[in-house]
C-alpha cells in the first residue's frame, strides 16, 4: 500500500486550519484522517475512526487534557474540525475503574464531557481511544487485515506475519467492554505498533500523526504482501444462457415496491471482475458465512441473495428466491431479538443480489444508498475471496451479528435518512439542458429525485446541476440513440418513475406559405419524438408494475399560437390528443 503522506501538504493543512484557530495537533489529525478516509482499501462510508490527545484551555484559562475523536458516522474522507468533537480526557480515564457500563450511560457520560455541548456524538469507540496511551490513534477496516482476521486459524496466521509487532484482541462488540479489553492487552504489550481485532479491524498509534499513519500503511502492506503470495486453483462454471437483465431489474423493483410501497434504485454491475466471481463453482458457499466486519451489517445485512442462472428468466422463480430470503431473515430476527430489548425488525430485503454467471445488483432507497451497498459488497467480495486463499473464512456468530445489526448506537447512524416523499424516484427530463428543463431538474434534485437529462449537448448547462444529474447526449429523433439511452438508465437505476417530455424546437413560418418540410421537421421534433419516448417509457412503467408519471410540455403555442408560430403550435397541439 502506497504511503501518501506529504510533508508539504501537512504544512498546508496546519496553515489553513490556523486561520480557523484550529491547533496544529488537530490540523494534522484532520490531514491523516483524510489520507486514511480517501483510501477505499482502508475505510468506507463512515467506517473507521481516529483521535488525537491534546491540551486546551478551559473557560478559566486552565490547561486541560482533551481528546478529539471522530464523530459517529462522520466520513473520514472529508470531515473538518466539526467532525472531531473534543472531550475532557480525565473524566474518560476515570471510567477505567468501572467493571461495567451500559451503552445508554456511556453515551450520556460522553456527551456530558464534551467541550462543546452542540458537538455531534463522538464515536462509539471513544473510550477505546481514550484508554490507549498514545497521542494519535488510527482505526480502519482494511480489506487486507479483514481477510486475515476472519479465518478459522487467524491467530496462527497473524503471529506468523507480524510476530511481536502487534497484539491480537479477540472479538468483543464495540463499546465499554472492548475498550477495557484493549487497555488490558496494550498494558501487557506496550511496545507493539498496533492492535489487530479479530473479526473487526486494526488500530495503530504513535506520538505523531505521521508515525501512527506510517504504522497503519506498514502493517497493512505486510498483510497485502502475504495475501498476494497465496495461490489456489479456482474452478469456474460456463453460463452461456442469455438473460434479459432489464426484465430482471423491473421484476425485482416491482417486488420491492410491493413489499415497502417505496421506489428503489437497482443497479446492474457487470464489469469483468463483477462477472468473474459469479461463475465460481463455489459461489453458493462463498458468501453465506456472515459479514467481514460487523459494521457492514447495518448497510447490506449479513449476506447477499444468490439467484441461480437457470432461474433468472422466470419472474416467478425470482420472486420465490426473494420471498425465501425474506422468510429466512424474519426467522433470524425472531430467533435473536431477545438479545436487544425493544428491537423492531428492519425491512428484510437484500441489498445485494448476485445473479449467477452475469453480475450482481446493488440496491438502495436512493442512488447514494445504492452506491454504499455496492462499495461495501465490493470490499466484502475481495476480502472473502482473499481469505479463502489462505484458509477457511469464518465470521462472527449470528448472535453477535444480530447484536451489532440492531444495536441502537449503530441504528442511530441510519436515522433521518430517506424521509423525503419522492426519495428513490427516477426522473427523465428531455430537453434537459434548456432553461425549463434545468429548472425542473433543480427542483427534482431538492426532492431527492434521481435525475437523468437528455439533450443534444450540455455546453450551457449549469455546472452544479450537471454534477448532480446523469447527462446523456441524445437526439430524440434517432431511435437507436433513444434505445441506447434508456438501456443505460435502466442498467444504472433499474426503472423509471417520471418522464418530463420537455424537448422541442420553435419552427416558424406563416401558414399561408410555409413549406411542407418545415411542418414535417416540426412534427418530427415536437410530436413524433415525444410520442416515441413516451411510448417506450410508458411500457417500462407498465412492466415495473406500479406505473409512473408522464408530463408533456405543450407550451401555450398548442392552444394560443403567436404570429408565424403555426408550424410549432400544430405539432405541440398534436400531443393534446
Pin down the residues of each PLM region.
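Substrate-binding pocket helix/loop in short-chain dehydrogenase/reductase
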Residues: 510-511, 515-520
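Active-site helix of classical SDR
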Residues: 534, 571-572
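Residue(s) in the substrate-gating loop at a strand-loop-helix junction
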Residues: 555
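Active-site loop-to-helix junction immediately N-terminal to the catalytic Tyr of the SDR YXXXK motif
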Residues: 514, 561-569
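Glycine-rich flexible loops
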Residues: 1-427, 439, 443
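Conserved glycine-rich cofactor-binding loop
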Residues: 433-434
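Conserved NAD(P)H cofactor-binding loop of Rossmann-fold oxidoreductase domains
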Residues: 502-507
Amino acid at each position: 500500500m502506497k504511503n501518501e503522506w506529504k510533508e508539504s501538504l501537512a504544512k498546508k493543512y496546519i496553515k489553513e486550519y490556523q486561520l480557523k484557530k484550529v491547533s496544529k495537533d488537530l490540523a494534522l489529525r484532520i490531514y491523516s484522517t483524510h489520507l486514511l478516509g480517501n483510501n477505499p482499501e482502508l475505510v468506507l462510508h463512515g467506517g473507521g475512526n481516529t483521535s488525537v490527545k491534546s491540551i486546551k484551555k478551559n473557560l478559566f484559562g486552565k490547561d486541560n487534557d482533551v481528546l478529539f475523536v471522530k464523530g459517529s458516522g462522520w466520513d473520514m474522507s472529508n470531515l473538518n474540525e466539526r467532525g472531531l468533537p473534543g472531550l475532557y480526557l480525565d473524566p474518560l480515564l476515570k471510567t477505567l475503574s468501572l467493571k461495567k457500563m451500559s451503552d445508554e450511560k456511556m453515551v450520556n457520560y460522553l456527551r456530558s464531557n464534551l467541550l462543546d455541548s452542540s458537538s455531534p456524538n463522538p464515536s462509539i469507540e471513544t473510550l477505546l481511544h481514550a484508554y490507549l496511551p498514545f497521542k494519535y490513534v488510527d482505526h480502519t477496516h482494511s480489506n487486507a487485515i479483514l481477510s486475515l482476521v476472519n479465518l478459522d486459524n487467524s491467530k496462527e496466521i497473524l503471529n506468523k506475519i507480524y510476530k511481536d509487532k502487534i497484539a491480537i484482541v479477540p472479538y468483543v462488540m464495540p463499546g465499554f467492554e472492548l475498550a477495557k479489553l484493549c487497555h488490558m492487552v496494550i498494558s501487557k504489550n506496550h511496545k507493539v505498533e498496533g492492535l489487530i481485532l479479530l473479526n473487526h479491524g486494526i488500530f495503530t498509534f504513535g506520538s505523531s500523526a505521521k508515525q501512527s499513519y506510517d504504522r497503519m500503511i506498514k502493517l497493512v502492506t505486510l498483510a497485502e504482501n502475504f495475501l498476494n503470495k497465496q495461490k489456489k486453483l479456482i474452478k469456474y462454471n460456463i453460463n452461456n444462457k442469455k438473460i434479459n437483465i432489464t426484465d430482471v431489474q423491473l421484476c425485482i423493483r416491482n417486488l420491492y415496491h410491493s413489499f415497502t410501497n417505496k421506489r428503489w434504485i437497482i443497479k446492474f454491475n457487470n464489469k469483468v471482475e463483477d462477472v468473474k466471481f459469479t461463475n465460481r463453482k463455489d459461489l453458493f458457499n462463498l458468501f453465506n458465512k456472515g459479514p467481514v466486519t460487523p459494521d457492514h451489517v447495518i448497510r447490506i445485512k449479513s449476506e447477499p441473495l444468490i439467484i441461480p442462472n437457470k432461474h433468472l428468466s422466470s419472474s416467478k422463480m425470482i420472486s420465490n428466491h426473494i420471498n425465501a430470503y425474506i422468510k429466512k431473515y424474519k426467522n433470524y430476527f425472531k430467533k435473536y431479538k431477545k438479545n436487544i430489548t425493544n428491537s423492531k425488525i428492519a425491512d428484510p430485503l437484500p441489498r445485494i443480489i448476485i445473479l449467477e454467471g452475469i453480475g450482481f445488483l446493488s440496491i438502495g432507497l436512493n442512488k447514494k444508498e445504492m452506491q454504499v451497498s455496492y462499495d461495501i459488497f465490493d470490499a466484502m467480495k475481495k476480502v472473502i475471496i482473499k481469505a479463502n486463499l489462505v484458509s477457511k473464512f469464518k465470521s462472527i456468530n449470528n448472535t453477535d451479528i444480530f447484536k451489532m445489526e440492531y444495536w441502537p448506537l449503530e441504528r442511530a447512524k441510519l436515522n433521518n435518512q430517506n424521509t423525503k416523499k419522492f426519495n428513490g424516484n427516477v426522473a427523465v427530463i428531455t430537453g434537459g439542458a434548456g432553461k425549463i428543463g434545468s429548472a425542473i431538474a433543480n427542483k427534482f434534485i431538492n426532492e431527492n429525485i434521481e435525475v437523468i437529462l437528455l439533450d443534444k449537448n450540455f455546453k450551457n448547462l449549469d455546472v452544479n446541476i450537471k454534477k448532480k444529474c446523469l447527462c446523456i447526449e441524445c437526439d430524440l429523433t434517432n431511435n437507436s440513440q433513444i434505445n441506447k439511452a434508456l438501456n443505460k438508465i435502466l442498467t444504472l437505476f433499474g426503472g423509471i418513475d417520471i418522464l418530463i417530455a420537455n424537448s422541442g424546437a420553435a419552427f416558424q413560418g406563416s401558414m399561408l406559405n410555409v413549406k411542407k418540410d418545415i411542418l414535417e421537421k416540426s412534427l418530427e421534433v415536437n410530436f413524433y419524438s415525444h410520442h416515441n419516448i413516451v411510448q417506450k417509457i410508458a411500457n417500462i412503467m407498465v412492466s415495473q408494475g406500479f406505473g409512473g408519471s408522464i408530463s408533456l410540455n405543450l407550451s401555450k403555442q398548442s392552444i394560443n399560437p403567436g404570429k408565424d408560430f403555426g408550424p410549432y403550435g400544430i405539432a405541440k397541439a398534436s400531443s393534446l390528443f
